[in-house]
Curated annotation (Swiss-Prot):
Amino-acid positions noted as binding Mg(2+) 1 in the UniProt annotation, renumbered to this chain: 13, 51, 73
Segments traversing the membrane: none
Keywords: Cytoplasm, Endonuclease, Hydrolase, Magnesium, Metal-binding, Nuclease
Signal peptide: none
Name of the protein described by the UniProt record: Ribonuclease H
Free-text remark on how the cofactor is bound: Binds 1 Mg(2+) ion per subunit. May bind a second metal ion at a regulatory site, or after substrate binding.
Organism: Methylococcus capsulatus (strain ATCC 33009 / NCIMB 11132 / Bath)
């Protein structure tokens, strides 16, 4: 990675109907004038797991090491990766209250995915009219909709 290399922007979002329930994740990737949309869903999950999965898939989708700015509306993801995870690791994946960290599998996967890239993190208020965040939200909901549609039995 060179210092002059343009940054890939990844706008991420997760959604869940029921929490737990069917959930989806969505990512809008932007690199210069190019954009790419990715999304998916899971039958039984939580909103926080889908928020994490969006960030993970954003990083795992990139074919080579990049400078990446991940923009999320999830304080859980942003604070988790930038503030909490180092302490969790030191405590053997326990919270300050000594209970096991939730979603440890996805936190560890996110840490691994992040290592390939030069990542910075940003937060934006969800559902506040930010076009890229709204696009990521639509993608996350498309992930749920397509999952539920695939579950229907043909007439």
């Amino acid at each position: 990675m060179s210092e002059t290399e343009p940054t890939v922007y990844a706008y991420t979002d997760g959604a869940c109907r029921g929490n737990p329930g069917p959930g989806g994740w969505g990512v809008l990737l932007r690199y210069g004038s190019k954009t790419r949309e990715i999304y998916g869903g899971e039958r039984e999950t939580t909103n926080n797991r889908m928020e994490l999965m969006a960030a993970i898939r954003a990083l795992e989708t990139l074919s080579r090491p990049c400078k990446v700015k991940i923009v999320t509306d999830s304080q859980y993801v942003k604070k988790g990766i930038t503030e909490w995870v180092a302490q969790w690791e030191k405590r053997g994946w326990k919270t300050a209250g000594r209970s096991p960290v939730k979603n440890i599998d996805l936190w560890q996967r996110l840490i691994q995915a992040e290592q390939r890239h030069q990542v910075s993190w940003g937060w934006i208020k969800g559902h506040s009219g930010h076009p890229e965040n709204e696009a990521a939200d639509r993608l996350a909901n498309r992930g749920i909709d397509e999952l539920l549609q695939s579950d229907k039995i043909p007439a």
